[in-house]
Amino acid sequence: WKMEGSRTFIEVGKKVPLIDLLRGLVIQSGNDATVALAEYIAGTEEGFVDVMNAYASEMGLSNTLFQNSTGLPNPSHFTSTRDLAVLGSRLISEFPDHYKLYKEREFTFNEIRQVNRNKLLWQDDSVDGIKTGFTSSAGYCLISSAQRNGMRLISVVAGSATSQNTFTSSQRLLEYGFRFFSTKKLLNGNEMIQTSKVWAGKSDSVPLGLESDLILTVPRATLKTVTFNYKINSNIEAPISKGMKLGVVDVLSDGKLLTSKPLIALDKVEEKGF
């Protein structure tokens, strides 16, 4: 089976455990393993590309369009560094068991030792992923992630002339981030932070809060000037179901919006009978 680019050396007609295909994709960047996985999941690589683009749309990757599963050059196949960072973040948060593969330095398949191309795994113990890449049109690329003292950062470098430049730039970005940024829990989830008047309800008010903790990674100096602006819907009437969105909270620093989160009802309020 001839396949352009990196390969895991899969033999045609031979059954391969799914975990070996995943390791071949993650560690070796094996295009043969990638296509095999795509065909197993969706029947054809083209069908899997449709799945990829659907997920990209769901994640808000507005500057991404896939044409193949391997990342090989195609004039209509593109993404951005921001979208890659978002994709990496979702991978880490939503598939933690799968993400453990990304820090493995090597594996052996078909009696061939295959080594992870991410040199940062050897240079920095806090680095646990994510993925290298190279094509003649994109240059040398690396999405890297590291975690120190409970704070995780993701770095994306693309278009480097050499692989060493990619690793050097990625390490510098991570060091800069850990030195000058901080991750802080600003508000607790499922905890009352505001109340709102309720019309025609068995209770005349409803507690409001966040669905989950509000955690932000920002420059250290920014934390000193954080303020909250609560925007609660007007004329809230019963019935109200628990979890109903009834407003938003804006997080600002020196008047600049950092993020917004929905304010939800923490309890239900039934309609008052007559």
Where do the language-model regions lie?
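Active-site-adjacent loops and short helices of periplasmic peptidoglycan-processing enzymes
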Residues: 1-85, 89-94
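Domain-terminus/edge residues, biased toward the C-terminal soluble/receptor-binding domains
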Residues: 62, 75-78, 82-274
